[in-house]
């Protein structure tokens, strides 16, 4: 059941999720702006479309599992009229995640109104493109300068680690982890028209 208040993002699972996927969805919803977690049940994508229209949501985020763990995040934008339905705007492939409770000294965050994607000091073209995709997918803002940090509630910090782009959500006021960690290995951006793979991010060119 959706909340009566206006929401920007609906976060849910694919059908028959594992407990770990459910926990991840709850964590992810807590750090996205004006997001609400919805239990999928037997709801179809069309059902989710009407849920989104009812609360004015601009995004539907669906988390799928691979071997029981969160493995893929599909992001849809509801379009009008209903015959158009949902447009898949991005697909984020994960090698794994770390839940908020698995971080030492992590804190909970409530009523997140704004998310910033931190690109300060990042010159890698691949990472910058993925940052742009995350901004589009999660209705976030790019944090380019230090003074931008205070304008967001949650800050997503990006770093290349081995062959993954590690994305960690930080409370902007305390500097403590307040959400899950995503280990991104590939991104498909259907709006910008590119697909990016993380291995060799410092060397390969976007396609």
Task: Describe the predicted segments one by one.
Residues 1-207:
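Phospho-regulatory, Ser/Thr- and acidic-rich intrinsically disordered linkers and terminal tails
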């Amino acid at each position: 059941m959706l909340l009566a208040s206006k929401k920007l993002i609906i976060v849910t699972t694919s059908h028959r999720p594992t407990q770990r996927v459910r926990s991840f969805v709850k964590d992810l919803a807590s750090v996205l702006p004006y997001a609400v977690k919805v239990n999928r049940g037997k709801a179809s994508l069309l059902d989710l479309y009407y849920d989104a229209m009812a609360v004015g949501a601009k995004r539907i985020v669906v988390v799928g599992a691979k071997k029981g763990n969160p493995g893929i995040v599909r992001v849809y934008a509801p379009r009008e009229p209903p015959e158009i339905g949902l447009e898949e705007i991005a697909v984020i492939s994960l090698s794994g995640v770390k839940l908020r409770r698995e971080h030492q000294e992590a804190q909970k965050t409530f009523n997140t109104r704004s998310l910033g994607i931190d690109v300060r000091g990042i010159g890698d073209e691949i990472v910058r493109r993925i940052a742009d995709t995350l901004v589009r997918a999660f209705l976030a803002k790019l944090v380019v300068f230090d003074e931008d940090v205070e304008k967001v509630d949650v800050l997503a910090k990006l770093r290349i680690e081995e062959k993954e782009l590690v994305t960690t959500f930080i409370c902007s006021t305390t500097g403590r982890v307040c959400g899950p960690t995503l280990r991104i290995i590939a991104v498909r951006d259907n709006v910008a028209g590119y697909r990016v793979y993380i291995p060799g991010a410092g060397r390969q060119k976007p396609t």
